[in-house]
């Protein structure tokens, strides 16, 4: 090798490593390379070169040159000329296989000196960087998603190739946590917001709870379809950019969810009011419709016509109602399809955030700090569902088009501004995605404890790009991990009852304790979800400080499941009866509960059995004024409430007032107290459950393991959950709203049946989770829940970095070796 060729070859090698000679005095501006008085130790400069060129060239075995070998040396001079080192023998032997081929093993037979000789240029005594390799046929965007190859881009923030130096300070775990948690919170907020407006949606579209349950399961279907494939391909690529793409998709889905309001809003409201009108009854101007501008001929459908022979029914079908019913049904089908597609897309979008973000955090923090980060992540995630309920309570206080309809939020005709939530949440998510796009593939190195210096990076084998043909093998490796499978089954049984409970918790509180919709949402947020967040943070701190064993963590998870199941059984006997409903007959086991007329006068009123408009008189409640035999009404100016008089079935009360009677049931306090204790106890298992999943599989398979669990939870938990619980809720219905012979939403539930079925099925499924947790506990001795982190100087490192120990560890399908 001549001096000229050696000079060119050495400079090309330096530049491929990121070296940028700035002057003639041996001071280099490389990325993390040690400077040693104008001379470089080739063992340090050689390390990144191995990681860049060792993919597919040979069998992966390269002889590292001895530390005494000098890559190049410089002599101070005015012409800034670099002099090649005298002895390149060791280096040439070490790079022999690399110099004879390209990066991917498809060399053209030219050496590096021949390939880049034409790039020599007098730039501060150095050479221009070689052009970007064109062997990879992927686009720039695909390359970005796969992580790229630039050393600078792997540790700095930026967009579209612009990575200013001041942005490097933001490439930290703390900044990523802020953006990631914002996305995580918005996702949880979106789902519980949708749950909080279910009553409004059911009333607007006249659909059953089972239908809304199927609608809610669409989000989980999106996760099932994409979880494992996404985590397999994106888990080894540029995870922040994949997460950002999911956030953009989620934003689009949220915006589309609000489209029905802007397309069909006015028409739906007009149709809904027509279907709620009854054409026969004494006139009452106070019940005119704001939307229809009804005249004084419009009537109150709740009053009694004594001795009347007309067919008085809210489901009477004249021509106008039939046409409106047909039009309303067509619009409802279109709107439900839009909702289904929106929730399906949002499920795909949130899969990227949930399954890629947590492993990304775990990879960038020490194993000792991981429990605390997991606790903060899961704890802050709880703010999303809580905020969703609170935001839903706020939005439903506004009328759907911000007009004054002539009645307040307690009126059955009230339709809240349900569409505000998707617009606001989608906008915030879109803004957060911009920040997520700017994060690098790998954050900067972990902080070292005081007094401990960083060790030089060891040779790292590059990760092989995931291939579709290897996907089944990776899935089989996860399925053969027995601990992961039992932990997955446990997660399904843990989350299925909790998801079902919270989906219909506001409705349960409304029915059981006669709360307003916005009050039920606030209680569900503060007494349930925020308590859960407190328990998660406390458990994370406990694991961080006490460092329990994996078996101890598994035992605690089983214990919390047993406590939760027992608590639900206790709550089955804590509720409020419906004995203050006139004519109520509870179920006796053979026949369902029902409400019958209380006097013969009501039998002659031809009342609409499907029109639930409760009134209160003398401490008793009646389905409607008609069922109480009331024949006249008036409006009380002080509070705009309707007063009914001349009630044949209430001789001792001169008048009755619309709405529920005051609830004298004191069991609400006991319910909230016991429920909060159960929620707190169960939430303390969340961090330990996450750590068991992350530690029971190979480090490279963490994202894939999350994908397996996410798919299983979606397929066997979250998809059937709202359908099962929706059917349970519908089974407790006493009065259905019916229009032209078609059942709509439920107007009144039997409190006893609702309580026993709703909480009973929750207790039973949670007990199955307890049984699965016992199996995990027996096998958990094979898991090291807090392994020594090599980058923190643990004894297990042996001078190697974490990446080396992961890449060198063989991946075998045997469960015992993967744990």
Curated annotation (Swiss-Prot):
Disruption phenotype: Development is arrested at the end of the first instar larval stage. RNAi-mediated knockdown blocks ecdysone-dependent fat body cell migration into the pupal head. In the fat body, results in defective ecdysone signaling. Residues 593-651 form the Kazal-like domain. Disulfide bonds join 599-630, 607-626, 616-649. GO terms for cellular component: basolateral plasma membrane; intracellular membrane-bounded organelle; plasma membrane. One of its GO terms (molecular function) is sodium-independent organic anion transmembrane transporter activity. Residues 1-157, 444-466, 787-819 are annotated as: Disordered. It is found in: Cell membrane. This is Solute carrier organic anion transporter family member 74D. It comes from Drosophila melanogaster (Fruit fly).
